[in-house]
Amino acid sequence: MKMNLEKLGERIIEGGDILVEEALELANLRGSALYPLFGAASRIKEHFVGDKVFLCSIVNAKSGRCPENCSFCAQSAHHKTDAPVYSLIDEERMVACAREAEKNGSSCYGIITSGTSIKKGEELERICNAVRRIRRETGITPSCSLGIINHETASALVEAGVETYHHNLETSRSFFPNVCTTHDYEEDVNTVRVAKKAGLKVCCGGIFGLGESVAQRIEMAYTLRELDVDSVPLNFLNPIAGTKLENAENITPMECLQTIALFRLILPTKRISICGGREKNLRDLQSWIFFAGASGTMIGNYLTTTGRAAEEDWQMLKDLNLSVASCCE
Amino acid sequence: MKMNLEKLGERIIEGGDILVEEALELANLRGSALYPLFGAASRIKEHFVGDKVFLCSIVNAKSGRCPENCSFCAQSAHHKTDAPVYSLIDEERMVACAREAEKNGSSCYGIITSGTSIKKGEELERICNAVRRIRRETGITPSCSLGIINHETASALVEAGVETYHHNLETSRSFFPNVCTTHDYEEDVNTVRVAKKAGLKVCCGGIFGLGESVAQRIEMAYTLRELDVDSVPLNFLNPIAGTKLENAENITPMECLQTIALFRLILPTKRISICGGREKNLRDLQSWIFFAGASGTMIGNYLTTTGRAAEEDWQMLKDLNLSVASCCE
């Protein structure tokens, strides 16, 4: 069944959906046969989310000592890695990093903490205070990624001015046991629902190259669609020494782009941002991510790995004739 | 007149031509509207010349002291630049560089000499001897670029085993007087004809970003089509201190890609290789050149500027799932 991507693109643009079997078939495309898939993804993106690029940055506000055993993670206490270990940074530092992110042109700034959840009381309060100051003193939109949360914490974050809560599913339901055995997938799914119920937008995606199959990547995309998340961060594994996946084979650039395009077709109206592992996995093909359907990218450093200088990303966007979305678009 | 690029691509694939006015209209496309143009160029390229990439390298065998006043050229005696000045390198060196180029994966190796023409007698003989040795001792195909030549020189090169003669028109007939006033455009056109008549294939293209208009770029493409050259090297100006164009504004990456695509549509069956100025002008978009219709690229250093390491180009080709054409394909 040779897919007519023009027609499929039009169907999705007119509000129709892509079927799982169609996505699985598109997953078999290779080499230049992928170009029409990218073309369709690009048209769908522009139709639903426009052609501006959304930039975001993060701060690793609390690092290491995580009791979870996620196979890829340098911050897991189950791994011996060089990832820094420190407790929650102070409010001043959170606000200073927000200013730095704004200076770099990011519209969204994520405060990320390692660990299954943050401790109620002092830790949550310090973050909420920082969010309030960031709201008052900068033009950047603060978001938080504090692990598994309940309604009380979610409401506190809303009250402090958090707009978006980030919590990844990391992979598909069927592959998750291969990634993490210290908590259940449904706890992550539930965190997404709790955050939405409290009135937060949800930024939820995952990481590819963990050993999952293409079908499992597609499975994850459909789960995100069911949960109706608001933005989807896509990471590509940057194997870190000391983790279970230190010797994992890198996902190829064209496979990264194919994954982005499939997510765009399955999640046509969502913000899809390319985050961790972009430079490492895409190399010379980084400039293809927007053609493949992404509408945003993280700039600056990642959680435990460094990103390239923001100026290089800005030059790439200029070279692509792409402009940057300002904050709340 | 909104061009249907699908239909235009099919017309060209079926042997039809693109009209000048159609090319001029495509020259107005900007941003993501260029993606379908690249898609059409890519399909046309694959139809006529396949999806393998042709790699070539050159040696600057005689440098500087050129009496011509080409505005872009660091080797012109009319300019004060840092370009090295040396007479014709010896046969041993020419052969050694051929081996280096072969090691880098190039299928074609160009022996280039500055100056209006090379001197008959000793200079020509030394080059012909080197060509004979390169033929015997390596698997790479030697080509020559020795300026304006007559039938006698062309025949000597054929006899020595040269397959392709390189001689650029540099720009369009109408813009040429702005580039060079020390010789006439028709001398270059005639050199192409002389070489073809002697049984040589001809590699003939030019350089963009000299101040020419888009229409003049298109004009040059149609002149090359009339001359029925065999391969078309496209260079993008890398402004060199001391030349008339030292402060020229760089042509943008998308303009470079648009030019490549237009040349593919106008010269559908030809080998189109991206040469000088690729890294400088295309930056993160170097990986788009083949999608835009190019079927080859120069690797290693250029005449008077350095190229990036061959390994980086090989990684880019691998990442694009593109394989390299072996020598005489």
UniProtKB/Swiss-Prot annotation, chains A, B:
Pathway: Cofactor biosynthesis; biotin biosynthesis; biotin from 7,8-diaminononanoate: step 2/2. It holds the Pfam family BATS. Its EC number is 2.8.1.6. It catalyses: (4R,5S)-dethiobiotin + (sulfur carrier)-SH + 2 reduced [2Fe-2S]-[ferredoxin] + 2 S-adenosyl-L-methionine = (sulfur carrier)-H + biotin + 2 5'-deoxyadenosine + 2 L-methionine + 2 oxidized [2Fe-2S]-[ferredoxin]. Binds 1 [4Fe-4S] cluster. The cluster is coordinated with 3 cysteines and an exchangeable S-adenosyl-L-methionine. GO terms for biological process: biotin biosynthetic process. [4Fe-4S] cluster binds at residues 66, 70, 73. One of its GO terms (molecular function) is iron ion binding. [2Fe-2S] cluster binds at residues 143, 203. InterPro entries: Aldolase_TIM, BATS_dom, Biotin_synth/BioAB, Biotin_synthase, Elp3/MiaA/NifB-like_rSAM, rSAM. Keywords: 2Fe-2S, 4Fe-4S, Biotin biosynthesis, Iron, Iron-sulfur, Metal-binding, S-adenosyl-L-methionine, Transferase. Gene3D superfamilies: Aldolase class I. Transmembrane segments: none annotated. Residues 48-278 form the Radical SAM core domain. Its cofactor is [4Fe-4S] cluster; [2Fe-2S] cluster. Homodimer. PANTHER family: BIOTIN SYNTHASE (PTHR22976), BIOTIN SYNTHASE, MITOCHONDRIAL (PTHR22976:SF2). Belongs to the radical SAM superfamily. Biotin synthase family. Catalyzes the conversion of dethiobiotin (DTB) to biotin by the insertion of a sulfur atom into dethiobiotin via a radical-based mechanism. This is Biotin synthase. It comes from Geotalea daltonii (strain DSM 22248 / JCM 15807 / FRC-32). The lineage of its organism: Bacteria, Pseudomonadati, Thermodesulfobacteriota, Desulfuromonadia, Geobacterales. The gene is bioB.
